[in-house]
């Protein structure tokens, strides 16, 4: 299972998409949720998707990043505690520094945000057999095993197929909502 998001700062909201996929990457179902850009509701959006899609046979929840949509975040540990399924957060580019500095400047609730971001812990670097570097945070599963799981369902490149598909449909859903002209009225 995989959850990814798509946003533009001007939208004010991020569209989260989740897909339930088999180990071979074949997608069986999808669900959507919204979160505020720069908000604190990323974990809630991911939780709504899990409530819609999770089954007993799901063995891993893959997240496309933990710090998302302009310093919103998804708390993998909270998802693991609530749903009793291993959760792994993947970042496919080297994480940019100075997150704390930016959060202090941008948000009045910066202390809460920094605490939540620190709670995520540092990522573990995983090197794929094809030479790609993936940064992984994991709960309920060893980060190396989470890296192997990602590699198993990666057809080409470095992004696992379920995350790639979730990212594509999140972007398509965001564009669709904008086309409807109702995007601003959803909240």
Swiss-Prot record:
InterPro entries: Endo_dU. Disulfide bonds: none annotated. It comes from the Archaea. Pfam families: DUF99 (PF01949). Signal peptide: none annotated. Belongs to the UPF0215 family. This is UPF0215 protein PAE0952. It comes from Pyrobaculum aerophilum (strain ATCC 51768 / DSM 7523 / JCM 9630 / CIP 104966 / NBRC 100827 / IM2).
């Amino acid at each position: 299972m995989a959850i990814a998001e798509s946003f533009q700062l001007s939208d004010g909201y991020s569209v989260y998409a989740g897909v339930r996929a088999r180990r071979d990457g074949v997608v069986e179902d999808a669900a959507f949720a919204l979160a505020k850009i720069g908000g604190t509701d990323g974990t809630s959006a991911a939780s709504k998707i899990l409530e819609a899609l999770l089954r007993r046979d799901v063995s891993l929840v893959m997240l496309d990043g933990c710090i998302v949509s302009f310093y919103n975040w998804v708390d993998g540990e909270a998802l693991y505690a609530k749903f009793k399924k291993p959760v792994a957060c993947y970042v496919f580019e080297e994480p940019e520094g100075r997150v704390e500095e930016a959060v202090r400047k941008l948000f009045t609730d910066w202390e809460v945000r920094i605490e939540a971001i620190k709670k995520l812990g540092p990522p573990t670097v995983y090197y794929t057999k094809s030479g790609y570097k993936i940064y992984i945070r994991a709960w309920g599963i060893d980060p190396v095993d989470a890296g192997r799981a990602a590699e198993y369902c990666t057809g080409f490149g470095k992004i696992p197929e379920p995350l790639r598909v979730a990212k594509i449909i999140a972007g398509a859903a965001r564009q669709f909502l904008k086309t409807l002209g109702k995007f601003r009225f959803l909240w």
